[in-house]
């Protein structure tokens, strides 16, 4: 109440922010007359002028932190003039002038916030303002879209403006090779999808050469449809995986018994709070979980012919039974997935689009394949993974735009530190939002929807019907066919021409049935979209040709004034400008006339057939109508059998039925019911937010480890000298551990296990300390350690002298990269196993997250210790072979002889086994049974990496079910100084590892 009173007096925070930006809008408008006098060349010259000013300012500073602060200041200074230049370029090149509210939206994006702009307010054009301004720094700007079509369309469409102003533009889509990707990332402005940006990051961190990496620094990203990417897809980690060796027979074995299990329910026991499970298993649709009863497990044991399911040897089967029940009870064909060409394809629950290449993880996808009787693919092992939350946190500055962000403002702030600013519409919103209509059954609801569409068709008012699944869109389509109502069905099965169908949904008398989110990013113009109609006509007449035709590339250039380029159905076409403009003008006249007719009919009518779990998705559907001051209307038709009502408002629905005694076919229309439904949606949103936060809390643990490993890889790729690290830290730590074990300080020297110490030193380093002149019996603990360390250092430097400094650095890099990659892959698998079982700790009154943090830290420490041990062992045991005699060369303390090549015992097999070295008696270690030269070894690595990177190029995300990146600035940290991350550990044992 108090907040409302304050808002009434002082205005809301949003209104105050808009008011604060208005003087800058006035500055930009004041510059417009002057800018309009510039010639095209003078306008372009301003880009070079801005760039020079930025570089001059940055040249005054050396520290990265100071440069970043200076960059922010200078960009803010030139913002009014840069926006004025961009606005004028938009008018000259695109025939589009930025409205004042679009200038405000651009300023919000530049400041690293989310700009909420209603559908049709020109978000694509708004983005050009902050993109142009920030691209002047030369550090690159990424514009992130939800699909390849929008990335191509926007890069080509807005690219004309950027090219006119002297900026380069690149686009990242699925089928590009590394050279094409690298070129696109080097551009001033790069368009692409969230998946492509994320997978490129993971692939870069699997590369063996710095020159093979494609991305550069993460400077500034603007995320289009930011709610879809950062909220809806937040539970979908990006995963690059490779096939595991496990058999798929177990999925078939388990699948055949599931139909013989009986579904039950949870009922109240005699004592308060007691729950009794009937049947063999119970399904919780609200949380998407299943619980198997004791009777159910007994039946499973009998059906599978095994002993106690709880025995460790049966844990794997237990997991597969639970996953198979989920596949049968919670995942339905034409709802969560479709079967196409013998393959199970996931349907995106938010967009209704198919997601080829994506697979559910944890064995779920295999369980669904077994259920549907298609080929069961092998389960995958994770090679690299990251969530969108942690990927987008890599950017120094992040911004977003969407038509619906306000309902998720708290989550954007908490997770991403992004503030939402609602931008006023350029024209008054005229859309009429009618109250919900609720029917008793789903059957009654769909009959009523069909009747309503029939009525609207009489007046030829266009209708866009939103459905939640393929199955329901096809069900409604059948009803309309019976009424002879012409319509278009747009769902995941027929999405290839999605943008075209949605763009024409505003034509007179048009009826379009689509999933709630179909065609997002495509404007629905009342009367139809003349450009789409012109494209179809030019293709039909053969006027337009594909750019990459069968006979070769069409002889035309994007900057040729006599041609027009455009995308259609995923392909690029070129058309003579004169013919294009003639055909376009014809259809423009037709659609302008039809536009007025549609307005008279009431504009686009949005008819929702079910409320989504999120209010935001409902608002997005409503937002398709009433763009830019056009009339429009919306209404939702619901039933008490809808999932939202049945699962999340069950008790309220039962009470409603009893009180009102609803009769068949009689609807309820009440704002009170709409409010209750929104309350149910708020509860679901809160639950989903907790799920996303839960995922992030776990991924933050992994993120720290990932940043440490990727940081080490980057150092190695950049060719930094690792000798000091290997000798002064790795060797020192390993030697210290050996001394603690065999010559502990608490024991008298006479009780030390010198034979054991000597054997371990020989096994790990190939050095016989006795033969090298170390006399343990005459030394104290410190002298013994120093003596051994000196001999180990001498051996390393002698080997380095023999093969040369450059070659030694090269082999250090190859060995360290291959060892850390193999260990990281194994670590990811172990982390998956840990996460699977960590929830059970709750039964022992232990916080699973705390336990996960503790155990994962121990596992990571163990992995890094193994990395150091294997690195040192492989480098020390690497043998030098005389090329003439093909025999090992003794490592002398002199210059290297001529005609030597290297031979090493490192990773003779591709999966890096331990080197088989025997020690003792002062003898040189024998050669391995099969020796592998480092040249051959590197070829093995290259082949292996090629396979993994090829898998990575085709990668899809797994779908199971914030810590800021630490940036160090200032003076170099010493190895024994406290680590900058605040862990309390020494730098050499933390981020210096």
Curated annotation (Swiss-Prot):
EC code: 7.4.2.8
Pfam family, one: SEC-C
Location(s), subcellular: Cell inner membrane; Cytoplasm
Comp. bias (Basic and acidic residues): 936-951
Cofactor-binding details, from the entry: May bind 1 zinc ion per subunit.
Position of the signal peptide: none
Keywords: ATP-binding, Cell inner membrane, Cell membrane, Cytoplasm, Membrane, Metal-binding, Nucleotide-binding, Protein transport, Translocase, Translocation, Transport, Zinc
Membrane topology category: Peripheral membrane protein
Catalysed transformations (reactions): ATP + H2O + cellular proteinSide 1 = ADP + phosphate + cellular proteinSide 2
UniProt-annotated binding residues for ATP: 102, 120-124, 523
Protein name: Protein translocase subunit SecA
């Amino acid at each position: 109440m108090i907040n409302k009173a304050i808002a009434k007096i002082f205005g809301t925070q949003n209104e105050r922010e808009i008011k604060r930006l208005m003087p800058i809008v006035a500055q930009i408008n004041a510059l417009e007359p002057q800018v309009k006098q510039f010639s095209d060349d003078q306008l372009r010259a301003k880009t070079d002028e801005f760039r020079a000013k930025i570089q001059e300012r940055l040249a005054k500073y050396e520290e990265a932190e100071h440069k970043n602060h200076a960059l922010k200041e200078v960009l803010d200074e030139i913002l009014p003039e840069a926006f004025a230049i961009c606005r004028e370029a938009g008018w000259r090149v695109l025939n589009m002038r930025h409205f004042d509210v679009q200038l405000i939206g651009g300023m919000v994006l530049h400041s690293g916030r989310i700009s909420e702009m209603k559908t049709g307010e020109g978000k694509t054009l708004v983005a050009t303002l902050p993109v142009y301004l920030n691209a002047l720094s030369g550090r690159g700007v990424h514009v992130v879209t939800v699909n390849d079509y929008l990335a191509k369309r926007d890069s080509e469409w807005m690219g004309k403006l950027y090219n006119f102003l002297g900026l380069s533009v690149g686009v990242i889509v699925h089928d590009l090779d590394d050279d094409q990707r690298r070129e696109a990332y080097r551009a001033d402005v790069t368009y692409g999808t969230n998946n492509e940006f994320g997978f490129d990051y993971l692939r870069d961190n699997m590369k063996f050469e710095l020159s093979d990496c494609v991305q550069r620094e993460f400077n500034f990203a603007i995320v289009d449809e930011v709610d879809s990417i950062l909220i809806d897809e937040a539970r979908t980690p990006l995963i690059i995986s490779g096939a595991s060796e496990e058999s798929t027979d177990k999925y078939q074995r388990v699948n055949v018994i599931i139909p013989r299990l009986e579904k039950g329910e949870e009922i109240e026991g005699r004592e308060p709070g007691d729950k009794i499970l009937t049947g063999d298993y119970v399904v919780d649709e609200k949380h998407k979980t299943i619980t198997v009863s004791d009777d159910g497990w007994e039946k499973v044991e009998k059906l599978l012919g095994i002993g106690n399911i709880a025995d460790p040897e049966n844990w794997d089967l237990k997991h597969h039974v639970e996953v198979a029940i989920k596949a049968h009870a919670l995942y339905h064909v034409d709802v969560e997935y479709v079967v196409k060409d013998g393959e199970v394809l996931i349907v995106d629950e938010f967009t209704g689009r198919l997601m080829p290449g994506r697979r559910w993880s944890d064995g779920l996808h295999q369980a669904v394949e077994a259920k549907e009787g298609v080929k069961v693919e092998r389960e995958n092992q994770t090679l690299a993974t990251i969530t969108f939350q942690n990927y987008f946190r890599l950017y120094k500055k992040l911004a977003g735009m969407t038509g619906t962000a306000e309902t998720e403002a708290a989550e954007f702030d908490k997770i991403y530190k992004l503030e939402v600013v609602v931008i006023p519409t350029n024209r008054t919103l005229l859309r009429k939002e009618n109250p919900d209509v609720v029917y008793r059954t789903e059957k009654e609801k769909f009959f009523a929807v069909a009747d309503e569409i029939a009525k609207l068709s009489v007046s030829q008012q266009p209708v866009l019907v939103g459905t939640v699944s393929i199955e329901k869109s096809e069900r409604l389509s059948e009803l309309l066919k019976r009424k002879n109502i012409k319509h278009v069905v747009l769902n995941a099965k027929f999405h290839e021409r999605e943008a075209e169908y949605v763009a024409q949904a505003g034509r007179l008398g048009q009826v379009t049935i689509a999933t709630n989110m179909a065609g997002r990013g495509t404007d629905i113009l009342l009367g139809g979209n003349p450009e789409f109609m012109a494209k179809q006509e030019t293709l039909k007449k053969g006027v337009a040709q594909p750019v990459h035709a069968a006979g070769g590339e069409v002889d035309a250039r994007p900057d040729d004034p006599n041609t027009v380029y455009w995308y259609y159905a995923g392909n690029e076409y070129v058309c003579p400008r004169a013919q294009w403009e003639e055909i376009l003008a014809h259809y423009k006249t037709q659609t302008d006339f039809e536009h007025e007719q549609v307005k008279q009919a009431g504009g686009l009518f949005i008819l929702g057939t079910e409320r989504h779990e999120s209010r935001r998705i409902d608002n997005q559907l409503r937002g398709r109508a009433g763009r830019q001051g056009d009339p429009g209307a919306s209404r939702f038709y619901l039933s008490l059998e809808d999932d939202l009502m049945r699962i999340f408002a069950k008790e309220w629905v039962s009470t409603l039925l009893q009180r009102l005694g609803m009769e068949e076919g009689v609807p309820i229309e009440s704002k009170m019911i709409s409010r209750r439904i929104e309350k149910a949606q708020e509860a679901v949103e809160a639950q989903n937010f907790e799920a996303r936060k839960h995922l992030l809390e776990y991924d933050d643990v992994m993120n720290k480890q990932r940043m440490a490993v990727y940081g080490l890889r980057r150092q190695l790729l950049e060719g930094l000298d690792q000798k000091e690290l290997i000798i002064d830290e790795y060797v020192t730590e390993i030697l210290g551990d050996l001394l603690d074990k065999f010559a502990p300080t608490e024991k008298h020297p006479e009780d030390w296990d010198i034979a054991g110490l000597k054997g371990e030193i020989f096994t790990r380093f190939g050095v016989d300390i006795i033969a090298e002149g170390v006399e343990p019996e005459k030394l104290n603990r410190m002298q013994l350690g120093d003596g051994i360390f000196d001999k180990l250092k001498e051996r390393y430097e002698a080997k380095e002298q023999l093969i040369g400094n450059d070659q030694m650095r090269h082999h250090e890099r190859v060995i360290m990269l291959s060892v850390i990659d193999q260990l990281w892959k194994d670590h990811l698998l172990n982390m998956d196993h840990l996460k699977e079982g960590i929830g059970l700790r709750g039964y022992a009154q232990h916080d699973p997250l705390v336990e996960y943090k503790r155990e994962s830290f121990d596992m990571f420490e163990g992995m890094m210790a193994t990395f150091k041990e294997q690195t040192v062992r492989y480098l020390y045991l690497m043998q030098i072979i005389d090329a003439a005699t093909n025999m090992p060369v003794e490592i002398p303390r002199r210059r290297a002889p001529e005609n030597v090549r290297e031979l090493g015992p490192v990773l003779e097999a591709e999966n890096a086994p331990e080197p088989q070295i025997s020690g003792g008696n002062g003898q040189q270690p024998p050669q391995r049974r099969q020796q592998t030269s480092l040249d051959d070894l590197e070829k093995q690595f290259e082949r292996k990496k090629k396979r993994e990177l090829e898998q990575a190029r085709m990668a899809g995300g797994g779908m199971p079910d914030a810590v800021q990146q630490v940036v160090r600035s200032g003076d170099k940290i010493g190895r024994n100084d406290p680590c900058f991350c605040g862990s309390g550990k020494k730098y050499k044992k933390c981020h210096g590892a």
